[in-house]
Each structure stands twice: as structure tokens, then as C-alpha cells.
């Protein structure tokens, strides 16, 4: 077993002595903790990046039983970790009575493993006696959930799924199939309490035929969650009711839980309830409502009723019991927070990334009673799975070598960028990147609250060093002079000059000759139509589309089935917003004829999809529902004259194959209809980074941006996008045009299909139109042609815009256009109002 240790500097939010239950022996609060009005993650100021405490991360590679199939879940009980695991069970052989061929499989057998977080020693509990499937039944035994106690004992919800077949006396499994006969399901649900060695302390049969089971209070067979409070009371839920039992398993009372569908959880030692999400639709009747979101509905033991519901923070799905410091702890975005109802405030306590831990493969976390935090990762290596336990424990920050910290602001962190930042921080002796994810400030009422907060901080002069610009208003920041021109760095760099990049993408990203963001890859957002139609028009604008529709059959649609007015407007605007807003000059042109024509075009689509169970499509004024079973692909509909255009994203060469080969290459990439007919395509940029114009460390910031782009492009084969590096793009292009043979583990060509010819590697595939719908009509392609490559390059050359989903502007448009779509306002008045509001917004933000 390998044992590795690294040190990591953590945010100041990690500074509670009594971090979790059991951390502070005397139960007193840390005197260093600020008062509730100045929480560790202040609501108006960015968190201090110099930590008072640091965490040491112990990495333990776990040695699992040889017959282990997979790990399902983990929880802490005191200072011990427990895993629900499934190991290889009984082998079953099945023989086809017709062909005589046989095949076998192994079923899974539940077991419970203990893990010592100090050493990583992992072992099955020696005295564990789980419920079993009756001998005359088929079935399985599963552990739905676990709850640990500080004394090291463990509660488990065990469900047994058993099926008994009514087989004839002469049944022969070699020649007959038991599934041809009637069967009876025999469910079982148990709450088991076990000691550290697996010995049974209690085993409560939740479905036992006792005094209550035959009455209306009897439990259902679908027990899905449970909890145990400090007094030993047990709570079980089947999504319909919540049952409360005493420590001996006697039913005390039940509550109707049909209104609050959710999972049971324990907030404090004596407080158990349902974690429930209240879905509120977007209808006008609910406009401005703050009732939506996550709630905790407590069980009141005294009144035997539901207590007063309490609003929870956004994304509260995994909850840990609270203590004297916080009402509860919860996971969000790979961090652990403490929350207080009284102040409606949250403090970030554990930031795995700040500990240089990559959480991409982390699927279980737990909090030990001594305050340590554990996480489990898994990584597939060939035919094996490596499980690693990462345990964080606090040390004095003075013991850690200090580094210069650069902050990176984002609204959600790209999966690959997370991994790259962790590796960068581990390997760089001088600098580290501290990520501030502003999506964590989202509320149920405002998912863009993080953008508002970041913008407010920028206005006040608190500007991060770096930006991940996805979902951020980069044009607005550039207009304010907040972001540096990256050309100034390129032009002084010998290894990453302008020639490094695909030039068409850089050109599209330019604002008045300056470059404010750099991606590691790109795709092309576009639309296509049959060449026989599209090539009749010199300009592909709204008028051309309307005329082209006259060449199709009655009831034909412009785009795919079900596109609505709002959907078309959002898609067209987000791919051509720069045609109506120029952040450099501040000029807006929503009162133009071009925008009014766009609104009129969108108004020709249906208001909404007609049914949840049907697909709606419409012509000029109507919405028609068709049965989902009649669905056809875009290619099939275009070929038969039912549809004019298909919207698509070309992320790599296989996307090109999928979209065009079904129509025998007889397509033209028209893009969305625009007034000039030339700007209907847009680049969607992958993981774009920007540098602050005010950073104290511009060279370090540029080195980081370079490193991230180079790393991504070196591993371009794993990136679902075209690489931004021209050299890497050319490599992928050459690869797409080159036939390759499948090889075995020895590097030898293989003939899996037995046709006598070595098998080729597929570069993509497409639907073959016109065949039997019951047949497999999929055709692989082994290499692109020069004509294919020419069309792809022509598409990239013709793309001049960048996908830009400016939430504030699109919200204004959406609000004002609703009256026009409803027939209550004309198009000119609508365009004038949008022009007035957007113009005011743009001037305020510049």
C-alpha cells in the first residue's frame, strides 16, 4: 500500500477550531471566528486568500478484496470509515434451448468494508450477518444508505428484493425459461445496527407482520431513506409516508409525506426531517415568487406533525449534522460549507481544490468525528480500478511554504481546467492559482447572482487576476478596461505567438483590433440546408428563408420539430448579438429594420410545444402536435421536404460526418438567417481565459494561460473540440483523412467481423436514409475526402462571429417581446422599447 503526503494552503474559511461535531471537546466556539455579521465568506468582499490554517492531505491507495466488483457509498462512524461494496457472487450458467449455446455470469453480493483513515487498511467486517434472499427465490440484497454514530457503530437500511417463481414440477432449466411462468415478489426492508466488527446490535424488520403491519399504519415496501436522532428514534421514508419508530422498532406514528417527496436527513442531533425541493414553474402566476427551491421540513416529535419548513441554500443535496457552531454542513461544488439559519449565512470550510485535490473522480466524502474530512476517488487503469482515500487534517499555516497567489474568477469551473490547475499548483514553487467560483452565490431566485457580485466587486476596484470568461460578460469588462489585450503578451513571447493559433478564431474574437480572451479549443455553431435550395440565394436572410419555404411541402418547418418563437429568437440572437450591440462604441441597433425582420420571423413559429407527450411543429401561424413515435431525424425530414434547415454544432470531424453524409454531401452550411447573409455562423469557444489589466503579476498570469492552452492542445485527442493550436488542428485534420487499422494488445491488425480483411478504425458514422426502420441503418466512415475537408475549412473561414449569451440583454429582449408574441404590441413599438432599455443598460455598464 502506498502512502503519500502533500501540504496545501487553504482559504481562511478553514479556520474553525470546532470545525465539526467532536472537534472541540468542551463544545465552546472558536474565539477567532468572526461574529455572524462578518462571516468567513463575506457577502460583499472576496474571501481573504491568506489562510490562518492549512490542511495536510494524506493519500492512501486502498487494497480491496480480490473479488471486489465496485464500491457504492461511504460514510463515517466516529473515526472509522465504512464502505458499501459489492463482490463477485455465485456463477450462473444459461443455455439457450434452441441453439444450445451457453453463457454465464456472476451476480453481486453485498458486503460492508471498514477503512482505517490513518493507514488505509481495508477489511470486511468479520461478524457481519446480512439478511439473505430466501433459498427458493431469486433476488438481491442492497444497502440503500448508511448513518454512522460517534461511538463507531453503524446503522444501515438493507433492502431485499426476492422473486419466487411458480414453476411446474417437471421444470427443466436446461430446456425452459423460468420467466415464462408466474412469479411473486417478496420484498424486505431492514434497519440494521451493527458494531465495528459487524456484530448485530439490532435488526428491525420494517415490514414484519406485527400489531401495526396489518393496519393502515403499515409500511410500504419501498423504503428509500432513513435517519436516526440522538435519542435513538428511527425515521424511515417510502416517498409516500414518513414512519417514526422508537429504538426497539415500535411504530410511534407516521406522517403523510406525499406533499414532500424527498430524502430524510439529520440536521442536528435531535432534528430529523425531509430534504424537499419545491419546483415552481415559470408561469406568469408565479412571477416574482420566492417559494421555489430547497427546503428542510422537520418532523415534530411532540406534535407528531410536520414542523415549520426552513429554506435551504441552493444546491443543498448532501447534508451533514450540525453542532454548536453551525446548524448543518453541506456539500456544494466540491466544497463543504457550514450554514446558520439565524443569520442566513454560509461559510466555506473545506475547499478541496485549495488543498490541491482534484475532485473530478471523487464520488464520496465523509466527515470524521475528530474533524478530519475524507474523500474517495476511483480511477480506471486498463482492466483494474484504483481506489484512493484522501484524508484532510489541519496543521499550522506557518509550516507551509508561502506562494504568490493569483485569483481566477469563474462561473462554474471546466472539468479539465480543474485538473490542470491542481497540477499547476502542485508543480509550481512560486505561484498558485486560487479559484473563486461565483456560481456558488447563485440563489433559487437569481442564478446569475454571482455575475452581479463579481461585477460589483470590479466596480469597487476588487479585480481578480484571471478570468474564465465562460458565462461572464467579457465584452462589458473589456469596455470598462478591466481586461488586458492578450496580443501585447503574444507579441513579446517567443513560443506562443499569433502564428500558434487558428487565425480565424482570433480574428472573430478581436474587439477593435484587441484580443481579450483565449480559448483552448473551438467549435462552429451553424445550420445547413440542401444545396439545391440554398444555392439559389446570394444572401441567406429572412426573406430568402421565407421564399425557400415555398419550395417545400405543406406543413414543412424551418427548423426541427417543436421550435418555438422564444427558442428561435434566443438561438438567433446569441449567435449574432454583436450585430445589434457594439460594446466598444456603445452603439445599439435594436430599432433597425434587420431586428424587426428577425422578430417577425420568430413570430411565425408556434408559441409553445403542444404536449409533453408529443412533438410540436408549426408553419406560419399554427402549432401541430405529432406522436413522438413518428419522430424523424433532421436529415430524413430535410430529404423528404418536411424541413428546410438543421441546426448543428461541429466540434470535430466526426460531427461533420454525422451531419452531412446522410444527405450524400449535398448540403450547404447557410448558418442562421441574418440581414447580411454572411454572419450566421459563430464560434463557440472552449475554456476561454482572460487576464486582468490591473494584475500585479502579468507575466505569471500569461505563463499560466500559456500553460493551460498548451496542456489542453497536447492532449487534444481527449478534448471534444477542435484544438486552437493550428499545428494540432492540422494533425487532427490529417488523421481524419487517413485510414487506420484496429490493433490488438500486441499491435497486430485484427479481423473481428471475420470477413477476411483487417478491420479499420471508424472516424464517425451516419444514418442511412430510406432503409427499413427496424434495421440497423448506421454506416461507419473510415476517412474523410479532400472535398469534405475543403467544406469544413470553408465553413471555418466563413465564420466571423462568436457565440455570446448575454443574460442581461437577452432577459430584456425576452421581457419586451412577450407582448408582441401575444399580439398585444406591434413590432416597431417592441423594437423601440428594446432599443431604449438595452441602450440604457449598455451606457450604464460602460
How would you name each of these model-derived features?
Residues 24-106, 113, 117-120, 146, ...:
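Conserved N-terminal structural module of periplasmic/extracytoplasmic solute-binding proteins
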Residues 60-62, 121-139, 200-220, 257-260, ...:
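Surface-exposed loop and turn segments in beta-propeller and other repeat-based domains
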Residues 116, 197, 201, 510-622, ...:
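Helix-loop-helix "hinge/cap" segment bordering the ligand-binding cleft or interdomain interface
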Residues 472-526, 540-544, 668-673:
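Hinge/lid segment of periplasmic solute-binding proteins
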Residues 660-743, 752, 797-798:
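Extracytoplasmic/periplasmic substrate-recognition and gating elements
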Residues 683, 747-838:
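C-terminal capping/gating helix-and-loop segments adjacent to ligand/active sites or protein-protein/ligand interfaces
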